[in-house]
């Protein structure tokens, strides 16, 4: 899950996480759990499709956000000092 890219898409459309939570008809805390993959929480296929349509995302953008393995700069440079 590339939460930075999802947040960038939301900002580009002038929306907050609360706006997306309302659109998906879920609580903000549940949305945050899915974005942060807290305790294995993940977006369902229908939620990903709804987000894709809502923001007009391409299939490639959906893959980059939800399916591509994302390594932060800190992680790729080894352990934090």
Predicted regions and their residues:
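Short, charged recognition helix plus adjacent turn
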Residues: 8, 14, 33, 41, ...
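Recognition helix of helix-turn-helix/homeodomain-like DNA-binding domains
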Residues: 26-42
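Hydrophobic micro-packing sites on short alpha-helices
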Residues: 47-52
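Alpha-helix N-cap/N′ positions at the starts of helices
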Residues: 1-2, 43-46
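A short, Lys/Arg-rich alpha-helix, primarily the initiator
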Residues: 1-19, 23
């Amino acid at each position: 899950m590339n939460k930075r890219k999802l947040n960038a898409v939301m900002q580009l459309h002038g929306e907050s996480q609360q706006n997306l939570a309302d659109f998906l008809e879920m609580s903000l805390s549940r949305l945050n759990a899915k974005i942060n993959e807290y305790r294995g929480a993940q977006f369902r296929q229908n939620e990903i499709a709804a987000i894709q349509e809502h923001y007009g995302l391409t299939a490639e953008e959906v893959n980059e956000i939800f399916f591509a393995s994302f390594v932060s700069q800190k992680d790729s440079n080894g352990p934090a000092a």
